Design a protein with these regions (language model features):
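Glycine-rich, basic loop-to-helix element that forms the pyrophosphate-binding segment
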Residues: 62-80
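A conserved acidic beta->alpha catalytic loop
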Residues: 38-46
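A recurrent flexible, glycine/aromatic-enriched loop bordering the glycosyltransferase active site
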Residues: 119-121, 134-152
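Short, well-formed alpha-helical segments that are part of the catalytic scaffolds
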Residues: 12-26
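Non-catalytic, C-terminal membrane-associated alpha-helical segments of glycosyltransferases
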Residues: 200-247
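Short aromatic/hydrophobic "clamp" motif used to bind/position activated sugar donors
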Residues: 85
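Acidic donor-binding loop at a coil-to-helix junction in glycosyltransferase catalytic cores
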Residues: 167-175
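Conserved donor NDP-sugar-binding/catalytic core segment of glycosyltransferases
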Residues: 93, 97-125
Length: 247
């Protein structure tokens, strides 16, 4: 088996069909499988996954880790057979040539490749967020790899101990990869769409969570503050401080 695609979902019946259809198209030329982890779903997510014929369907009815998404990723990894592991979130749509472009980049000490994630400008708020994402290009911090559409060598995941119980398992993964003197590559010319319809509540909660995750990963307050200022996300710094006060 060459590629195992891990997709984790919690009540994503609005988006998961489009996601799985795009993954199937992208895998058409490859020996691959879809490992689908349905995390305590109470909607039609599981039925839709069955409709699209995922190769391994794991219905997760428990939560033993503090961070359930990280737990789902680890469960998916333990049930994967591929040489390469691809993490594709349930609200992401990938292009047909996704793996054809991503796999050749894995050479030398490059063991992980992440694509550019852009918000689909389908609603007014989505269009605002799509425009805001362009601030990555003018800030001094640049853009870090994201886990929403990634390919990584399975043997490297095994070497670093898989996924850990943290709020931001993708960033945590990149940190541990670098500590092993490997490279995690971000490519802005391979684009995937984030198709979720954004709400103001999701934006606010996302900033709080991002700040808390930065604290948990050992990122300094000054860097979190700089991110808040340059990226116009003031609640990230507040989320960092709130998590710091808890400890």
């Amino acid at each position: 088996m060459l590629i195992s695609v891990i997709t984790c979902a919690h009540n994503e019946d609005k988006y998961v069909g489009k996601c799985l259809a795009s993954i199937r198209r992208a895998l058409r030329k490859f020996d691959g499988e879809i490992v689908f982890v349905a995390d305590r779903c109470t909607d039609n997510t599981v039925k839709i996954a069955e409709k699209y014929g995922v190769d391994k369907l794991i219905e997760k009815t428990w939560r033993r880790w503090k961070n359930s998404y990280a737990e789902s990723l680890q469960i998916g990894l333990l049930n994967s057979s591929g040489k390469y592991i691809s993490i594709i979130d349930a609200d992401i749509v990938v292009p047909e040539n996704f793996f054809e472009k991503m796999l050749p980049l894995m050479r030398g000490n490059i063991v992980s490749v992440s694509a550019k994630v852009e918000t689909l400008p389908s609603t007014l708020l989505n269009r605002v967020l799509y425009a805001w994402e362009k601030t990555h290009e003018i800030t001094p911090f640049g853009r870090e790899p994201r886990g929403a559409a990634r390919v990584i060598k399975k043997k490297i995941l095994s070497e670093i101990g898989g996924f850990r119980d943290v709020m931001a398992p993708d960033t945590d993964l990149d940190i541990r990869v670098r500590r092993k003197n490997y490279r995690s590559l971000y490519v802005d010319w391979i684009r995937v769409w984030h198709i979720r319809e954004i709400t103001l509540r999701k934006i606010i909660n996302g900033q709080f969570s991002s700040g808390a995750a930065r604290y948990q990963l050992g990122i300094s307050f000054m860097r979190a503050l700089g991110h808040s200022i340059f990226r116009l996300r003031p609640l990230v710094a507040y989320g960092w401080l709130r998590e710091w006060l808890k400890h």
